[in-house]
Amino acid sequence: MNKINAAITAVGAYLPEDVITNDDLEKMVDTNDEWIMTRVGIKERRILRDKNKGASYLAIRAAQDLFERHGIDPKSIDGLILATNSSDYHFPSTASIVAHEIGCGDIFSFDMQAACPTFIYALEVGANFIRSGRYSKILVIATEKMTAFTDYTDRATCPLFGDGAGCVLLEATEEEVGVMDAVLHSNGIGKDHLIMKAGGSACPATHETVDNRWHYVYQEGQVVFKHAVVDMCNSCVEIMERNNLSHDDITWVVPHQANLRIIDAVARRMGVPYEKVMVNIERYGNTSSATIPICLWEWEHKLKKGDVLVMTSFGAGFTWGAVYVKWAYDGSTVR
């Protein structure tokens, strides 16, 4: 039996129409455009303002975009893995809601949560379902309504986050394309540096936790920045060395869009020219697990079969990693 690979054969995304600019934030907190651009490189971010719509709404729209533009029948999907840090509810899973709404039938579906790298974790998990030989098509969606947990009285964190969703379809192939390798890591030493302090079983919601604003993202920015630069750079070097890749072999670097200075550091460490790096943080901010698939969607028309992509991310926990992908189709042919 020939080796089975898991190829990315389609991408989709959805971004809400409403925008929060740096000028808007200047009216809410003590900040300004120059301060935000200098520190993180974000000009604006998208927001899903409807309080009755959660991450599932964004995921549904992203999946529909993929189905419509690529001519995919939802009934052909064997399973759905949903990456999110902003699920609609603790239970049921957001994945089950999405699978039903997009018309996939009674397929298996589940949520994954590994902070901002959840998409690359889910990509490797989905690829292994394909490699098992039991499944032909796995839909991997990353969806985030991060603004629901953003404190718009905190000048340190409110400029960072935006809402959005992106997705990819993994399909079985015997060609030498697809998810070729992944390095995934975690270390709980970072727990207290990037956290939502309340709402889980360790600290259930009370009047006190609400009054203390513990249901919003808390971040110690300098600590997180230092670890992110080191760990994202190291994971990229690790996957390049494991696969004998030089910087000349890489067509595109797809970094998590958390901070422009982190992205710059990763590109320098890999020795890759900046024109090979996908960057859209200025327009969308940090959409957590969704940043990488949103990049793939935005750059799809430039991607060619055989292109070598290295994706890398870092997040709470700490969690981090990198994935090596050989692109499976010419994006210029897609609507």
UniProtKB/Swiss-Prot annotation:
Q: Which GO terms describe its biological process?
A: fatty acid biosynthetic process; secondary metabolite biosynthetic process
Chain segments annotated as transmembrane: none
Q: Name one GO cellular component term.
A: cytoplasm
Active-site residues are 116, 256, 286
Q: Does the keyword Lipid biosynthesis apply?
A: yes
Could you list this entry's UniProt keywords, alphabetically sorted.
Acyltransferase, Cytoplasm, Fatty acid biosynthesis, Fatty acid metabolism, Lipid biosynthesis, Lipid metabolism, Multifunctional enzyme, Transferase
E.C. designation(s) = 2.3.1.180
Q: Which domain of life is it from?
A: Bacteria
Primary residence: cytoplasm
Q: Where in or outside the cell?
A: Cytoplasm
Pfam families with a match to the protein in the record: ACP_syn_III, ACP_syn_III_C
Q: Does Transferase show up as a keyword for this record? A: yes
Q: In which pathway does it act?
A: Lipid metabolism; fatty acid biosynthesis
Q: Subunit details for this protein?
A: Homodimer.
Which protein family is it in?
A: Belongs to the thiolase-like superfamily. FabH family.
PANTHER family, sorted: 3-OXOACYL-[ACYL-CARRIER-PROTEIN] SYNTHASE 3, BETA-KETOACYL-[ACYL-CARRIER-PROTEIN] SYNTHASE III
Biological function = Catalyzes the condensation reaction of fatty acid synthesis by the addition to an acyl acceptor of two carbons from malonyl-ACP. Catalyzes the first condensation reaction which initiates fatty acid synthesis and may therefore play a role in governing the total rate of fatty acid production. Possesses both acetoacetyl-ACP synthase and acetyl transacylase activities. Its substrate specificity determines the biosynthesis of branched-chain and/or straight-chain of fatty acids.
Q: What is this protein called?
A: Beta-ketoacyl-[acyl-carrier-protein] synthase III
| Naturally occurring in which organism (per UniProt) | Porphyromonas gingivalis (strain ATCC BAA-308 / W83)
